[in-house]
């Protein structure tokens, strides 16, 4: 079971009815089912903030010391490493509950990027959601090897949902 909490701090998000708990749960489940190590966990939790440029700028400055709005910020609750996800190690312990983390999305930046990249707002949001969830479970793109692994997984998941890959 995946519990999703959505907080909307910007009314423009309400125009996109497809961006809802059901969509977020479906994508999260698709990602988690790819890794056997998550199979023992019965309940996952994920918090989503749908906000605007002013608020995300404050969060970006506070947590990353970058004074500019960004499309999305991910705050993992656990320090996971993507390499552990592919091993049979019991890296999650015996817990049957896991809070994946928090994700904050910025409406204006996502809107502008989707227009510039000739994508629908919803498809761009889905790509950023996939990217962010992968960050929450330990994926990163600090070097070319990690970036390629993460991008290939994103492409695979996007294709599953019928979305043309951006790379």
UniProtKB/Swiss-Prot annotation:
Subcellular location: Cytoplasm
PROSITE patterns cross-referenced by the UniProt entry: UPF0054
Pfam families: YbeY
Tagged with keyword Secreted: no
Residues noted as binding Zn(2+) in the record, renumbered to the chain: 131, 135, 141
Any one GO CC term of the record: cytoplasm
Cofactor binding mode and count: Binds 1 zinc ion.
Molecular-function annotations in GO: metalloendopeptidase activity; RNA endonuclease activity; zinc ion binding
Cofactor(s) this protein requires: Zn(2+)
The protein's Enzyme Commission number: 3.1.-.-
GO BP, one annotated term: rRNA processing
UniProtKB keywords: Cytoplasm, Endonuclease, Hydrolase, Metal-binding, Nuclease, Ribosome biogenesis, rRNA processing, Zinc
Entry keyword annotation includes Cell division: no
Major location category of this protein: cytoplasm
Segments forming a coiled coil: none
Family indicated by similarity: Belongs to the endoribonuclease YbeY family.
Function: Single strand-specific metallo-endoribonuclease involved in late-stage 70S ribosome quality control and in maturation of the 3' terminus of the 16S rRNA.
Protein name: Endoribonuclease YbeY
Organism of derivation: Rickettsia rickettsii (strain Sheila Smith)
């Amino acid at each position: 079971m995946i519990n999703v909490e959505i907080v909307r701090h910007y009314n423009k998000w309400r125009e996109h009815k497809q961006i809802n708990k059901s969509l977020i749960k479906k994508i999260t489940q698709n990602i988690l089912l790819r890794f056997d190590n998550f199979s023992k966990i019965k309940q996952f939790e994920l918090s989503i903030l749908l906000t605007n440029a002013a608020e995300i700028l404050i969060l970006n400055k506070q947590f990353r010391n970058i004074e500019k709005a960004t499309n999305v910020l991910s705050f993992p609750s656990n320090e996971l490493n993507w390499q552990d996800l592919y091993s049979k190690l019991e890296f999650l312990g015996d817990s049957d509950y896991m809070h994946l983390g928090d994700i904050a999305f910025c409406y204006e930046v996502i809107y502008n990027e989707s227009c510039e990249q000739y994508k629908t707002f919803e498809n761009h949001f889905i790509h950023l959601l996939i990217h962010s969830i992968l960050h929450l479970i330990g994926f990163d793109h600090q070097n070319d090897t990690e970036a390629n692994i993460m991008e290939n997984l994103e492409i695979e998941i996007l294709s599953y949902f019928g979305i043309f890959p951006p790379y």
